[in-house]
């Protein structure tokens, strides 16, 4: 859909076939960039939030469900953390969580839409927080698909895909060519991770994504959690590596250093989230 619908009593809804998901609040910004429609809202339940092309992306008071689930299984398990790549993530939340690790020396964020960054910095400053001023962060306002295709082989220790649903500017983040380029630029001992949709609301997209990543990398597993404002609330992130499923085993020293500052992630939570694969998904993947 191109834009969220707003009802007379202040409900702002994301629509899909036969269902809708909404928050009550007011629209602060509704504009169209060269790439997508961007809406910023102030909700009574979750604070200020961001929608792209009418789909919920994030909100102040529940964003950690998403960002901690994407970042910490990868950064707690990769062999090295010197160079990190984030594709998308213009709200700043993924970069913020990555830069909590002192071993990260350089983080490339590649975000195609300048307005997503600018509006997030203005209206949702807590998401990016200190990351925007951290000298380790390099913001590249470029096409992430082209960036990955042109990057040097074995140039990143961790690659995180923080894109929207597979439509519009994010459509190319879900195909085999893109995943093959990610594998090519991942260093030995590295970890790749991407959001991989809802196993309930977008079941076939989720299954196809996990299957394709597993085919390309050799080792890949979905992790399941919840993002309250997303369709069905049930979400997934898929982690991959070339040299074995290292993403399942957080390194104790890193986990101890990072877990105290987390609201959702912990080694125990992560173990359960990987094991929480539904039977119907497991059957499809074996």
Swiss-Prot record:
Name any one GO molecular function: spermidine synthase activity
State the superkingdom: Bacteria
Which organism does this record belong to? Answer: Prochlorococcus marinus (strain MIT 9313)
List the taxonomic lineage.
Bacteria, Bacillati, Cyanobacteriota, Cyanophyceae, Synechococcales
* Pathway assigned to this chain's UniProt record: Amine and polyamine biosynthesis; spermidine biosynthesis; spermidine from putrescine: step 1/1
Spell out the subunit comment: Homodimer or homotetramer.
Originating gene = speE
Q: Which reaction does it catalyse?
A: S-adenosyl 3-(methylsulfanyl)propylamine + putrescine = S-methyl-5'-thioadenosine + spermidine + H(+)
Question: Which amino acid positions bind S-methyl-5'-thioadenosine, per UniProt?
Answer: 36, 111, 143-144, 169
Q: What is this protein called?
A: Polyamine aminopropyltransferase
Enzyme active site: 162 (proton acceptor)
Question: What EC designation does it have?
Answer: 2.5.1.16
Q: Principal localization?
A: cytoplasm
Q: Name one GO cellular component term.
A: cytoplasm
Keywords annotated in UniProt = Cytoplasm, Polyamine biosynthesis, Spermidine biosynthesis, Transferase
Q: What does this protein do?
A: Catalyzes the irreversible transfer of a propylamine group from the amino donor S-adenosylmethioninamine (decarboxy-AdoMet) to putrescine (1,4-diaminobutane) to yield spermidine.
Question: What residues does the PABS domain cover?
Answer: 9-242
The cross-references to CDD domains, in alphabetical order and at most eight, read: AdoMet_MTases
Write out the similarity annotation: Belongs to the spermidine/spermine synthase family.
Question: What InterPro entries is this protein classified in?
Answer: PABS, PABS_CS, SAM-dependent_MTases_sf, Spermi_synthase, Spermidine_synt_N, Spermidine_synt_N_sf
Q: Where in the cell is it found?
A: Cytoplasm
């Amino acid at each position: 859909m191109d834009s969220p619908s707003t009802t007379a009593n202040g409900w702002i809804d994301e629509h899909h076939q036969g269902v809708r998901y909404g928050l009550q609040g007011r629209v602060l910004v509704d504009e169209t960039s060269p790439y997508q429609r961007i809406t910023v809202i102030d909700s009574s339940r979750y604070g200020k939030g961001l929608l792209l092309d009418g789909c919920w992306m994030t909100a102040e008071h529940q964003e950690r469900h998403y960002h901690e689930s994407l970042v910490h299984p990868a950064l707690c398990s990769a062999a090295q953390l010197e160079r990190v790549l984030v594709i998308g993530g213009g709200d700043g939340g993924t970069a913020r969580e990555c830069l909590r690790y002192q071993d990260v020396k350089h983080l490339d964020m590649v975000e195609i839409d300048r307005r997503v960054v600018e509006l997030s910095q203005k209206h949702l400053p807590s998401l990016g927080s200190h990351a925007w001023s951290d000298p380790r962060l390099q913001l590249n306002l470029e096409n992430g698909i082209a960036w990955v295709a042109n990057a040097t082989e074995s140039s990143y220790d961790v690659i995180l895909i923080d894109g929207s649903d597979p439509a519009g500017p994010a459509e190319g983040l879900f195909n085999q060519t893109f995943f093959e380029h990610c594998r090519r630029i991942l260093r030995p001992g590295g970890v790749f991770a991407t959001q991989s949709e809802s196993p309930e609301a977008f079941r076939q997209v989720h299954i196809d994504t996990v299957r394709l990543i597993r085919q390309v990398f050799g080792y890949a597993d979905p992790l399941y959690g919840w993002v309250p404002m997303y369709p069905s609330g049930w979400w997934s992130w898929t982690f991959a590596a070339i040299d074995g499923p290292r993403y399942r085993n957080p390194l104790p020293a890193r986990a101890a250093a990072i877990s105290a500052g987390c609201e959702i992630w912990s080694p125990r939570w992560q173990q359960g989230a990987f094991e929480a694969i539904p039977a119907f998904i497991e059957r499809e993947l074996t």
